[in-house]
Amino acid sequence: MQPIISFEQFNFQYKHAAQPTVKDITFHIYPGEKVLIAGRSGSGKSTLAHCMNGLIPFSYEGISTGNILIAGKDPRKKSVFELSKHVGTILQDQDAQFIGLTVEEDVAFYLENECVNQDEMKKIVSESLKKVGMHTFHKQSPHELSGGQKQTVSLAGLLTTNAPMLLFDEPLANLDPASSLHTIELIKNIHKQYNKTIVIIEHRIEEMLNLDLDKIILIDEGEIVAIDTPERILASNILPSIGLREPMYIEGLKRLHFDSNNDVIYPLENLHKESISGVIKEWMEKKAFCKDTPTKKELLKVENLSFSYPNKQKALENVNLSIYEGEIVALLGHNGAGKSTLAHSLIGINKTKNSRILIDGVNINSWSIRKRGEIISYVMQNPNHMITQSTVIEEVSFTLKLKKVSKEEIKFRAEEALKICGLYPFRNWPIQALSYGQKKRLTIASVLTANPKLIILDEPTAGQDYYHYKQFMSFIRKLAKKGISFIFITHDMNLALEYADRAIVLHEGRIIANHTASIVLGHPATLQRANLKESSLFKLVKFSGIANPGKFMELYFDDIRREEGV
């Protein structure tokens, strides 16, 4: 069988780059395969994707050497339009992909370019939307849809092209756990029904394993470091060495010093149940549960908070909660559960009645957004939505200039914030020279100049690979030790388990759980109601058959925190 995608000793160097971004790339993908190309940020995986769909060299100029064939043809000698008939692409930023004002108009875009007659076009659009379960949304605006629904509409648009290859660029970015699983099941169904070749660019290995991949291609610093089956990749210990995360249950097995005797450790069900049970019980006997719970001062208190948008049902109903100094709290729930509404109510965007929001015992209901912003800072998910200045130092100084603070004070506070955030060496850099992770830290530095007591972070680790995720969260923990409190709005269960002191779960505007993350995320009924999913570590513990899985989870993460000095 001839490969449908073929790279042989391929190199590519961007026009203004000093050296090649990808070097000596050789691999083959065959028709009908499901392949994951994984690597941390800047590894070169997106460059390979752009070579496949023609964005290189037609949108991104540079020099290439070696051989590349897509469906037997050299893509460098074809137009992007010609390549789109062979390779359909779904971008990470779904909003950037939409053309039409309605769902059906967007799905019809390719057919309009092909001058398909209207009757045939309507039939194909309807069939494509039915294939992905979105036919009832055909008159809606794409921008009214959730992240998962946008992904699904984009896929429907690709199905109208009959392209034999589908290329997904980080398809799970910004999706809640339920939407992620839906997207994966959708891709599996499309593959099963139409035998499409599936290529996925992603750094989250654990979630993508649900796709039943044929092989994984690992790339690091522009070079391929491994091509193998998921089973062999996970048994090789290579993922941590290139800054990628192993499934949490495999991390757990290593922490428990489990000896697999070279048995296959993936999938989880292949493990020997009695051996797992034995090693977990032995580990628990050695560990004493010693949770240090010093008395902390209450910083924020919310009493009877309710909020309704115009002409809609209540978005929040009778919410009561407290946040303590230096505490990190994960705010969890499905899309539409009320997480963002709660955050907007705390910072004053949403005006509430008959409720009390207290900071250090003072009711701030009458405070303006600006005054609240001096105590409670809100950091958006996408740093590009917050950054307005051209250099790092200008961005961090901007708020202080608006407050007419003296030049000496501005310089001192801005430089101090940059030092705390590890950005002082880059203070004179242009913003566009920063990485995504550095921009995230810059947004934190900007709010730190106001000396806030509470920082709300919307999806703090979205778009960051595991290496930068660890760096960023280590930085957040240091700030928490200084007494700053944090609320994370997140879909990342691993983040909540590892870093949050507490997890609060919202469902239909109400709090349905408020406890340590290990207890909350080990409660099946809560997970089901809130469209959250079990961690693979909890699945492993349940699989072992031990009497109290929740106790193990609490002990396990307590042990990690003590080791890290938390």
UniProtKB/Swiss-Prot annotation:
Q: Which Pfam families match?
A: ABC_tran, DUF3744
Q: What is its membrane topology? A: Peripheral membrane protein
GO annotation, cellular component aspect: ATP-binding cassette (ABC) transporter complex
According to its UniProt record, where is this protein located?
A: Cell membrane
Task: Please provide, alphabetically and separated by semicolons, the GO molecular function terms listed in this UniProt record.
Answer: ATP binding; ATP hydrolysis activity; ATPase-coupled transmembrane transporter activity
- Which E.C. number(s) belong to this protein? 7.-.-.-
Residues engaged in binding ATP 2: G333, H334, N335, G336, A337, G338, K339, S340
Query: Which amino acid positions bind ATP 1, per UniProt?
Result: G39, R40, S41, G42, S43, G44, K45, S46
Predominant cellular place of this UniProt entry's protein: membrane
Q: Does the keyword Nucleotide-binding apply?
A: yes
Q: Report the residue ranges that make up the ABC transporter domain in this protein.
A: 5-246, 300-533
**UniProt keywords, alphabetically:** ATP-binding, Cell membrane, Membrane, Nucleotide-binding, Repeat, Translocase, Transport
For this protein, the record's SMART domains field holds: AAA
Family (UniProt): Belongs to the ABC transporter superfamily.
Q: Which NCBIfam families match?
A: PRK13648.1
Q: What does this chain do? A: Probably part of an ABC transporter complex. Responsible for energy coupling to the transport system.
- Name-wise, this protein is Putative ABC transporter ATP-binding protein BA_2641/GBAA_2641/BAS2461
Organism of origin: Bacillus anthracis
